[in-house]
């Protein structure tokens, strides 16, 4: 584990003991004011269907310290209720108000700017039902708006519809930009990969992307939980989404090396993706609570 001063252009090459002390000092500067641990899920608290070792105890320690845990995921293949069930199945704990997904951010965005508009949602049936329950007027033909989610039930017919609607000029919203989804053996194609496919066929880029690292999701979280940016720490394994999300919204940031990013990658990050602190895993924060 090590600490990176944001006024420096690179990661200081210091001993493990010095790095630990520097990290502890950095955390102590702001950890006491934190009210919400905003946690990425894939690669941060679990990988695939396996929780990262010690995670149940770590989450319990965070809650016992008086902080709130909020699971913040770009993965729009599941509903909030499905995430609660997944957490329970793998031995972790989560309640409905502790889950915030890019789909939820997208529903809020649609209700703010496109209320009563006809919306085509390319998503799993469960996620489409979540959009409908959120007040979105779903349609399969002639939409005003198209939403591209992480559809693990994707078919050619759905892609053809999306392409046709985009070429006709529908507003184009993507839930999030991730190219791949972490998995134990081979990463899976995610919404970013679908975006590239549709770019080739339609010539369109999303007009708006709602999930991390963008401010649509950050503003929604601040409004939902009634906190200020400096009272949130974003913890995740992806610098270009999780850490940049924190930077874009004024949150504190912790990069964990339990998922997509290894120590070598963490040493060569651009300024926009540089975290306050790097930890091997979320478990390492317990001693500072």
Q: Model features per residue range: what roles?
A:
Residues 3-6:
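Short, positively charged and aromatic/hydrophobic N-terminal segments
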Residues 15-20, 24-41, 46-65, 81-100, ...:
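Asp-based, Mg2+/Mn2+-dependent phosphohydrolase catalytic module
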Residues 75:
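Conserved phosphate/oxyanion-binding catalytic-loop motifs
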């Amino acid at each position: 584990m090590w600490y990176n001063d944001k006024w420096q252009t690179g990661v200081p090459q210091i001993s493990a003991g010095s790095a630990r002390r520097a990290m502890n000092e950095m955390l102590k500067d702001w950890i006491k004011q934190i009210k919400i641990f905003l946690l990425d899920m894939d690669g941060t608290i679990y990988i695939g269907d396996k929780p990262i070792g010690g995670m149940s105890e770590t989450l319990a320690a965070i809650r016992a310290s008086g902080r709130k845990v909020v699971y913040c995921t770009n993965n729009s293949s599941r509903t909030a209720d499905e995430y609660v069930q997944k957490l329970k199945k793998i031995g972790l704990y989560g309640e409905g108000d502790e889950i915030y997904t890019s789909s939820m951010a997208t529903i809020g965005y649609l209700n703010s700017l496109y209320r009563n508009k006809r919306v085509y949602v390319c998503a799993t049936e469960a996620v489409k039902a979540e959009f409908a329950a959120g007040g979105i007027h779903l349609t399969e033909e002639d939409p005003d708006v198209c939403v591209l989610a992480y559809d693990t039930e994707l078919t050619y017919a759905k892609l053809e519809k999306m392409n046709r609607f985009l070429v006709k000029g529908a507003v184009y919203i993507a839930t999030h930009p991730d190219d791949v989804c972490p998995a134990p053996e081979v990463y899976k194609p995610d919404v970013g990969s679908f975006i590239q496919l549709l770019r080739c066929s339609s010539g369109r880029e999303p007009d708006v992307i709602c999930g991390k690292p963008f401010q649509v999701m950050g503003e929604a979280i601040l409004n939902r939980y009634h906190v200020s940016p400096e009272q949130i720490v974003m913890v995740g394994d992806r610098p270009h989404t999780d850490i940049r999300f924190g930077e874009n919204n004024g949150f504190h940031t912790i990069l964990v090396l339990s998922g997509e990013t290894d120590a070598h990658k963490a040493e060569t990050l651009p300024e926009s993706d540089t975290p306050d602190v790097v930890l091997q895993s979320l478990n390492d924060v317990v001693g500072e609570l």
